[in-house]
Amino acid sequence: MNTRLWLCAATTFGLAAAISGCSSVEQSRAVETARPVSASYAYQGPRSPISVGKFDNRSSFQRGIFSDGIDRLGSQAKTILITHLQQSGRFNVLDRENMTETRQEAGFNRQEQAIKGAAYVVTGDVSEFGRKVVGDRQLFGVLGRDKEQVAYAKVSLNVVKVQTSEVVYSVQGAGEYSLSSREIVGFGSTASYDATLNGKVLDLAIREAVDKLASGIDVGAWKPVP
């Protein structure tokens, strides 16, 4: 009996020592960010000064009865659009979101601002956005199951001429992202909710729309004035 107690105590102590001896491993790496395809092509034409106007979420996503009324998706889309417009190399993008901060810094430097006006304003909407979870089961789930998260986004962009308020060019972009994993006979990982899919699919749809804007300039479908 004493021998059994001693063995149990030794085993428990050994497990505790093994657990306490484990150390966490911290890993990090830089992840390459995607740029518009148009950014990889040299452009020698005129760059029109543009600003980004309203960008609203017109989809049903985050607009239910329990919504707080803050358009986070539209705000995120606007930031992404400004970045990709500048990266495309076809435009001189003017920032209108930080006017107070730039005015303050100019005052600190005792400089007078010379704010440049835009020839065009790009407005946009997230017209479609949604997520769904799909899956299948092998032999009624005995042999495993697959769970896949799918996010879809569609955006619309309109280029408005400041002088006349005329919509001179319009494009749409759409994208889909999915995340899946398979669990086989109780082993493996399942696809838990990944909130980053929202940003990834929105970025993809906007990149496609910006590439269409740039392509329109390259083929002469519309000619922005410098």
Language-model features, listed with the residues they occupy:
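Bacterial N-terminal signal peptides that target proteins for export
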Residues: 1-10
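A structural "domain/chain start" motif
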Residues: 22-93, 98-106, 110, 179, ...
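Soluble periplasmic/extracytoplasmic beta-strand elements of cell-envelope proteins
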Residues: 49-56, 80-84, 92-94, 119-127, ...
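Bacterial Sec-type N-terminal signal peptides, specifically the leucine/valine-rich hydrophobic h-region
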Residues: 16-19
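Active-site donor-binding loop signature of nucleotide-sugar glycosyltransferases
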Residues: 175
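Juxtamembrane/interfacial segments around transmembrane helices
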Residues: 168-172, 207-208
